[in-house]
UniProtKB/Swiss-Prot annotation:
The keyword RNA-binding applies. This is Eukaryotic translation initiation factor 3 subunit G. GO terms for cellular component: eukaryotic 43S preinitiation complex; eukaryotic 48S preinitiation complex; eukaryotic translation initiation factor 3 complex, eIF3e; eukaryotic translation initiation factor 3 complex, eIF3m; multi-eIF complex. Component of the eukaryotic translation initiation factor 3 (eIF-3) complex. It holds the Pfam family eIF3g. The keyword Protein biosynthesis applies. PROSITE patterns: RRM. RNA-binding component of the eukaryotic translation initiation factor 3 (eIF-3) complex, which is involved in protein synthesis of a specialized repertoire of mRNAs and, together with other initiation factors, stimulates binding of mRNA and methionyl-tRNAi to the 40S ribosome. The eIF-3 complex specifically targets and initiates translation of a subset of mRNAs involved in cell proliferation. This subunit can bind 18S rRNA. It comes from Cryptococcus neoformans var. neoformans serotype D (strain JEC21 / ATCC MYA-565) (Filobasidiella neoformans). Keywords: Cytoplasm, Initiation factor, Protein biosynthesis, RNA-binding. It is found in: Cytoplasm. Residues 1-12 have a biased composition (Basic and acidic residues). Belongs to the eIF-3 subunit G family. Residues 204-285 form the RRM domain.
Length: 290
């Protein structure tokens, strides 16, 4: 009876051992090639023998101290207790990607996607009055730059001189009748009040015509900057079309020193620039043009 129980127990143990996979074995031959034999189950639940031959070579690399310390950390999780190095059962070895930081100047700027057309409540497309973009004028990103030269594009790109007539000045000498009267029109006033643009109007300004439409403000400054020896170069603006922003071949350049402006006019007037002959002359107020 005891022999029968012992035989039954051995039969069950043999059945359990038959379902287990044999252990993985490794062997190295005289040529240094390691043969790794492992077992696995395929899709049909059959045992499959996998043989891999690997040639191992010692490769020495220099790493930082912190990286060397991380390699000494004990493994955890599914790799706990396993030898150093990646285990193919739990680790996917990919391609090494080398990260290189490029200078900011060499990074290509990503072109912004074209804005979708903004429509007004009436259903019409909204067009900016400054840059003709499809957005409201109040939200134009170039509002400050374009608004600063709107007066130049109006008619000749110069400010008008405000002249107060004698009758208007005399009118302010009487009774105001409870209404606000500007200081320039009050009793005892000699003329117009101070203007914010007085310092700008008093600068010696040159009018440049026959300018290439491809020239930019930076090119204009580079052309006139060498003559600014007694003072700084003031404004250098190119008159552009209000809608297309294309140059009209007209520009205005101001100097702090009249002597510098005269030298620039004498040297550049009639000079060839970008296949055109420049015409440089004094800029005259709108009322004095001929």
């Amino acid at each position: 009876m005891a022999d029968s129980k012992q035989s039954n127990r051995d039969w069950a143990a043999d059945d359990v051992d038959a379902d287990e996979l044999p252990p993985t074995t490794e062997s190295t031959d005289a040529n240094g090639i390691t043969t790794i034999v492992s077992w696995k189950y395929n899709a049909d639940d059959q045992k499959v023998k996998v043989t891999r031959r690997v040639r191992r070579r010692l490769q020495v690399s220099t790493v930082t101290q912190t990286m060397a310390e991380r390699k000494q950390w004990p493994k955890f999780g599914l790799d706990k207790g396993k030898p150093p190095g990646p285990d193919r059962k739990t680790t996917i070895i990919g391609e090494n990607l080398h990260f290189k930081i490029a200078p900011i100047s060499k990074i290509q700027r990503v072109e912004p996607e074209p804005e979708t057309a903004v429509k007004a409540p009436t259903g019409k497309a909204v067009v900016c009055r400054l840059c003709s973009g499809q957005h409201y004028t109040a939200r134009c990103p170039f509002r400050e730059q374009l608004a600063a030269i709107d007066n130049l594009n109006a008619d000749g790109a110069e400010e008008e001189q405000v002249v107060v007539s004698g009758t208007l000045a005399a009118k302010g000498a009487g009774e105001t009748g409870g209404k606000y009267v500007p200081p320039s029109q009050r009793a005892g006033a000699t003329g117009a009040g101070d203007s914010m643009f007085r310092a700008r109007d008093e600068l010696p300004t040159l009018r440049v015509t026959s300018l290439s439409i491809d020239a930019e403000e930076d090119d204009l400054r580079a052309l006139f900057q060498p003559f600014a020896k007694n003072g700084k170069l003031g404004r250098a603006n190119i008159v552009r079309d209000r809608n297309t922003r294309v140059s009209k071949g007209l520009a205005f350049v101001s100097f702090e020193s009249k002597r510098d402006a005269e030298a620039a006019m004498a040297h550049l007037n009639g000079r060839g620039y970008d296949s055109l002959i420049l015409e440089v002359a004094w800029s005259q107020p709108r009322g004095e043009r001929t």
